[in-house]
Amino acid sequence: MQSFELLSPLIDGSTKVSENEMYKTTDYLRNGVLYLNNLLRPQHKKLSTLMIYSTTKCQSRCKHCSIWQKPEEHLSLRDLQKIMASRCITKNTVVGLEGGEFILHPESTAIMEWFMRHHPNYTLLSNCLNPQKVIDAVRRYNPRHLYVSLDGDRDTYKVMRGCNGHDKVIEVVETLKNEVPISLMFCLSPWNTFKDMDYVIRVARKYEVDIRIGIYGTMDFFNTTA
């Protein structure tokens, strides 16, 4: 899963998101207070967001991410519980579970069940290559938000990610769009174009879901150096 630089939560005023508001006024106020706290009390900093790359296992073969070439490693449920015990994490900290592909983690169900019970303010990121497993996980473990990767149409998807996953992403979006807030994650890279970005924007409009646009960049953890 590629790291994202948020360009705009919505492309323009005609792009409608789902019935569930992505952000409320209280979210902005809370983050403002958090920023002031971290600025004025550096010894008592709190996190607004924590992304946990809990596994290197992934069934995609992406050109813009080489994590699938790394040795298989996982953070255990016990590891995650230790992280969550940190004093910089509060009940308002949004925790993102990703990888690799998080649902391939050998303890994925136990981890999601723990978060559902002890820190329900968590999100799930997925490539949706196992659509039924993603659908079942969302319905059973109730993540606050689902982020799914879509970098272009069928042809671009296959070129960029090395597999036929486009229709599986659409299946998950069609099935869950009225059950959980969904964001399409588009990464602009040397392997796709602005035409692909326009395509993904139109998909977001069709299903009335959010879209996030990021720009490809190098990152040691993903072995992205080109």
What residues fall within each predicted segment?
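Conserved alpha-helical substructure of the radical SAM core
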Residues: L7-D12, S18-R144
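Radical SAM enzyme [4Fe-4S]-AdoMet core and its adjacent flexible, acidic
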Residues: M1-Q2, L6-D12, L75, R144-H145, ...
